[in-house]
């Protein structure tokens, strides 16, 4: 009996000790400091990851302006900010070409049918395998054809979907065009603009921001400008006095000897003076609009020229429709003559300041070889 009592007391002691340990452990765990929360992603400093390679489009032509298929790295000298660069590779790759067609025609000075013919001339002159897209714009841009190599299909789209509009907003169109090049290889991007370059205010994107987007994709821009053609047409429309059709009218038809049966004078003779009918333009508001448009074309011509030359493309200023069509073929040759040259810059891209611009110069090391490239590039802010 005494042993049972002793055994029972021992069990109680063990239970008491166990409970005390459990309470102490719980108290200690409650006094522990809570772990620091993991910083949110937006609080972390973004890591800039750069691919230390520049892809530079260079057009290579012979004396006659034709594509030179024999270009090698020994033929090309590349300078970046005045420092010679070591070329890694030279490739002739299939191009990605977006046609940006101005169909705004408020004053009747741009011919949509002619623009269509120009676009078809460019398309039919491009190398087989070229990826082509088509966008038209007036008050807003409209994508008519996504990327394709089907030339007959694109021609059908041009014949059935191109429609004239009113005023043109080039800045919105340039921004929309830049968006189409996502996922395309750098160095193969081309935009062909057929326009007078006059930008109607009130668009969603300013021209400054549109040009920033254009520079970011580093596309070569080729321009067929309506500016000279439009000004030639304006010369006749802005005159207050316009001559008639050149047909002489009799001032007094009743005195005409032929009409009165007088056989004494020849049929072409008359006893009264004759005159030519003309017209006087009394629409002052329209004349003012035409003058404003003329000034706008001169400003836009300068801007279009800068855009083309900065990107390594060319601007053409035809004086008649036949020139316009012929120059469309020249643009296709320019696109087909372009190579992609790659090099690792001697000054690392990772060391560049955000938005840093680097000047690029190219020179030929071979007689009879002519090279053309963009003037420079903005270091991409890769994240």
Regions found by a protein language model. Name each.
Residues 8-9, 13, 56-57:
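Short amphipathic alpha-helical "recognition" segments used for binding
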């Amino acid at each position: 009996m005494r042993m049972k009592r002793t055994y029972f007391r021992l069990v109680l002691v063990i239970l008491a000790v166990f409970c005390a340990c459990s309470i102490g452990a719980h108290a200690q765990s409650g006094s522990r400091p809570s772990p620091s929360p993991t910083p949110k992603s937006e609080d972390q400093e973004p890591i800039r990851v750069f691919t230390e390679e520049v892809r530079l489009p260079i057009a290579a032509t012979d004396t006659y302006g034709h594509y030179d298929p024999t270009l090698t790295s020994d033929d090309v000298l590349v300078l970046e900010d005045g420092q010679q660069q070591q070329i890694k590779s030279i490739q002739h790759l299939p191009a990605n070409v977006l046609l940006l067609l101005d169909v705004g025609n408020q004053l009747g000075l741009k011919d949509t049918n002619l623009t269509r013919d120009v676009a078809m001339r460019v398309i039919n002159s491009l190398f087989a395998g070229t990826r082509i897209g088509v966008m038209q714009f007036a008050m807003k841009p409209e994508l008519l054809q996504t990327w394709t190599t089907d030339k007959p299909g694109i021609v059908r789209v041009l014949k059935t979907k191109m429609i004239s509009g009113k005023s043109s907003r080039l800045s919105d169109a340039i921004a929309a065009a830049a968006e189409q090049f996502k996922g395309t290889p750098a160095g193969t991007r081309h935009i062909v603009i057929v326009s007078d370059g006059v930008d109607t205010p009130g668009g969603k994107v300013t021209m400054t921001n549109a040009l920033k987007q254009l520079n970011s994709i580093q596309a070569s821009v080729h321009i067929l400008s309506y500016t000279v053609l439009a000004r030639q047409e304006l010369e006749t429309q802005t005159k207050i006095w316009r001559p008639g059709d050149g047909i002489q009218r009799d001032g007094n038809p009743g005195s005409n000897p032929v009409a009165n049966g007088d056989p004494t004078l020849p049929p072409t003779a008359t006893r009264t003076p004759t005159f030519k009918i003309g017209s006087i333009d009394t629409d002052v508001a329209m004349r003012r609009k035409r003058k404003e448009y003329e000034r706008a074309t001169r400003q836009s011509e300068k801007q279009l020229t800068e855009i083309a030359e900065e990107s390594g493309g060319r601007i053409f200023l035809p004086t008649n429709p036949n020139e316009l069509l012929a120059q469309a073929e020249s643009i296709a040759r320019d696109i087909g003559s372009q190579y992609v040259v790659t090099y690792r810059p001697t000054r690392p891209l990772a060391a560049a300041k955000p938005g840093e611009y680097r000047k690029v110069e190219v020179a030929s090391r071979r007689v009879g070889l002519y090279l053309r490239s963009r003037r420079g590039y903005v270091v991409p802010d890769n994240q």
